[in-house]
Every structure is written in C-alpha cells, then in structure tokens.
C-alpha cells in the first residue's frame, strides 16, 4: 500500500464492527455514487433525502457482522455488492430483537435499501475469500436533526471524518 493509505482507506485494527479489515470512509468515487443514486433513492423511499456519508469495506474469510442497529447518519441506508464471493445479509423487520431474520442475497451490482437505525441487521461468519461492499447513507429531510447532520456533519462531501463539526 502507498504511504497515502490512511487518506483513502486503511486497515482498521480496532474497528468495533469488523476488526482488521480494509475500509474507506468517504471515498470520493463512492460519495459521487451516493449523489448519483440519490434521485433513485428518493423515488424508492418516497422521501426527500440529505446525503450523509459512504463507507466501503473489503471483508475477508472469517469476518462476521454482529447484529446491530446503525447510528443516526444511517437512517436510510443501502448496502451495494461491488464484487467477490456471496455473503447474505439478514434483516429483522419486526423490530423484535433475537428473531431469526430474513436472508437477503446480493449479487454484484445489487443494492439493498433499509432503515439502518430501525432494523437489526447482521451477517453470519463469512466463508468466502473476499466480499466488497459499499454503504450509502442518507437522512430523511423531515427527521429532526437531519439538516444539521448533512454530510455526516462535514462541511461537504469527500472529506475524511476528522472534518466533522
């Protein structure tokens, strides 16, 4: 990796969700994708949305995404399969913790839209070699605090997380 890897992405040893994976917060290409997808997202959800941030990750064999709900910036979320081996995501739409959930398989190019703050979601232990995902996150313009949270509290898109206000 280049000496610039901490600018464009990095291996995160202490990541709370998936330690020791390569990840990128706010990659400029992914943030551009988020803006390009916004009209379709608004049509799909029936909501006017503010863009929050993007996050991309390369998962490896043995990784596991524990059951969780997301933070406020992930109110309206997507996960898009960019390539690699199959790795289903599970959602629990009833809102009841601990239930089995619904399995969703995503092929490369497929994108799932979900309410990240409301739905428990997870992935079981990964058995493949690698799986590349990007997450595009938005807020509903009508949600209190959404305007102040635009761009995940950065002055504009494309900036690293340390620019948050």
Question: Which ranges hold each PLM region?
Answer:
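Non-heme Fe(II)/2-oxoglutarate
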Residues: 1-45
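Alpha-helix initiation and capping sites
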Residues: 31-35, 50, 69-72
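A short coil-to-beta-strand element that immediately follows conserved catalytic motifs
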Residues: 46-55
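Conserved active-site beta-strand element of glycosyltransferases/polysaccharide synthases
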Residues: 58
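Catalytic core of non-heme Fe(II) oxygenases with the double-stranded beta-helix
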Residues: 61-122, 130-134, 139-154
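Glycine- and charge-enriched low-complexity intrinsically disordered segments
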Residues: 149-165
